[in-house]
């Protein structure tokens, strides 16, 4: 399962120098404040003076004290974030905690331990905007911070996450009062923000779970490594992920990680987190060892095949899920597919006969969901049997990555009109389910 076509926080471009970004934002803010003044009173330019950006205003006074104080505080917070990042990457927990008030230490200890267990190799912190006073808390400021991270591989493209931080002025250096949970509408809260984690790292995967499920970790790692070898062959752009990131959730974590709230029929999902990465989450409840193999192949194939921005929409759901199901069955004969009974029931009634009308509702019953996945698998299977896996992946790239019309992509890749191919796929499904 995927999260459809999520719009992630648009924070995935290579970071600029932190201070330059911050000063540019402050400059725009100041210009907006003065836009109502007559043009004759404002003649200015922005010049880069070493490590500072200065806004010159001929005939106007220096910035007001509040603006100047916010700028200076932002510089000091940035320095503290830099110290904390250096300590994290060095494995220096005392240094990681040193920038914070004691009340924040328990949460920061958990974050530090989880990130170190995940083998964090890149940790960059850049202020997003300027500090704002916290109402009712004199001397306390809130600042959004964009954190970028890599696990295991030091040269990966970092994944971004935007987190609110609160700071208290205390002498020369501000002190971190609290680090909030990220609450992106698209991705929700990452596991390392909220949970203790135990982690195993293999040649192709990083697998994390909770201490309560520690005993399952060796088997999970073995199965994930086997699934990764299958998923690698579905990397549409030819470059599989540096590591597949898999998070195995207990009941409480399933409701909390990445925002929770998944449909009841969901056994796992892949969510895009930026930096070219999709993180896979598995629901520990109700998974059998055999079912876990199929599910891992399915979800890791999403991570290998999907573009960073997600897929175009529900009309292409059948292609996205059909490819993942095709990888999940891993070459087994079609008559051994476990969902054939559900396919027969859905094909006999309740389905319009259109592939672009297969995406199940969140509250759909389990047999309707299984039938939708099964029909999608059979349609993709038919296309692979006729044209081969390589051309199917070319078709997938054109439709899902390049977002071209299905009819246009079919003509170019398969050399046949899409209406005829669509009808052939449907006939194949009905022939097997009749």
Residue locations for each model-derived region?
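Short, low-complexity N-terminal intrinsically disordered segments enriched in polar/charged residues
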Residues: 33-34, 39-90
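Short solvent-exposed beta->alpha transition segments
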Residues: 69-72, 90-136
């Amino acid at each position: 399962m995927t999260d459809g076509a999520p719009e992630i926080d648009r924070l995935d471009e290579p970071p600029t120098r932190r201070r330059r970004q911050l000063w540019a934002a402050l400059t725009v803010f100041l210009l907006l404040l003065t836009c109502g003044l007559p043009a004759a009173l404002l003649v200015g330019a922005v010049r880069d003076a070493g490590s500072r950006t200065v806004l010159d205003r001929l005939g106007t006074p220096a910035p007001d004290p509040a603006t100047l104080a916010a700028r200076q505080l932002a510089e000091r917070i940035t320095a503290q974030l830099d110290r904390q990042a250096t300590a994290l990457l060095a494995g220096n927990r005392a240094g990681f905690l040193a920038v914070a008030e004691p009340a924040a230490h328990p949460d920061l200890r958990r974050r530090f331990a989880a990130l170190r267990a995940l083998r964090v190799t890149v940790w960059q912190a850049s202020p997003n905007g300027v500090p704002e006073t916290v109402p009712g808390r004199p001397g306390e400021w809130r600042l959004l911070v964009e954190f970028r991270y890599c696990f295991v591989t030091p040269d990966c493209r970092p994944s971004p996450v935007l987190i609110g931080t609160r700071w208290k002025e205390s002498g020369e250096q501000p002190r971190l009062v609290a680090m909030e949970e990220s609450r992106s509408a698209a991705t929700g809260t990452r596991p390392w923000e909220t949970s203790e984690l135990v982690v195993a790292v293999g040649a192709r995967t990083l697998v994390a779970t909770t201490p309560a499920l520690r005993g399952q970790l060796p088997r999970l790692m073995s199965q994930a490594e086997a699934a990764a070898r299958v998923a690698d062959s579905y990397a549409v752009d030819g470059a599989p992920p540096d590591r597949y990131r898999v998070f195995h959730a207990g009941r409480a974590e399933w409701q909390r990680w990445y925002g929770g709230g998944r449909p009841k029929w969901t056994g796992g999902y892949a969510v895009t987190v930026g930096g070219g990465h999709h993180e896979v989450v598995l629901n520990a409840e109700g998974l059998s060892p055999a079912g876990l193999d199929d599910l891992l192949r399915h979800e890791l194939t999403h991570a290998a095949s999907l573009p960073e921005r997600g897929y175009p929409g529900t009309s292409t759901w059948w292609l996205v899920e059909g490819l993942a199901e095709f990888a999940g069955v891993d070459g087994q004969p079609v008559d051994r597919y476990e969902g054939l009974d559900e396919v027969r029931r859905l094909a006999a009634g309740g389905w319009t006969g259109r592939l672009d009308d297969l995406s199940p509702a969140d509250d759909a019953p389990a047999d309707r969901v299984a039938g939708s996945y099964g029909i999608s698998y059979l349609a993709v299977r038919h296309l692979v049997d006729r044209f081969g896996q390589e051309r199917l992946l070319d078709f997938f790239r054109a439709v899902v990555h390049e977002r071209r019309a299905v009819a246009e992509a079919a003509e170019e890749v398969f050399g046949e009109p899409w209406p005829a191919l669509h009808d052939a796929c449907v006939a194949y499904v009905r022939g097997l389910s009749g």
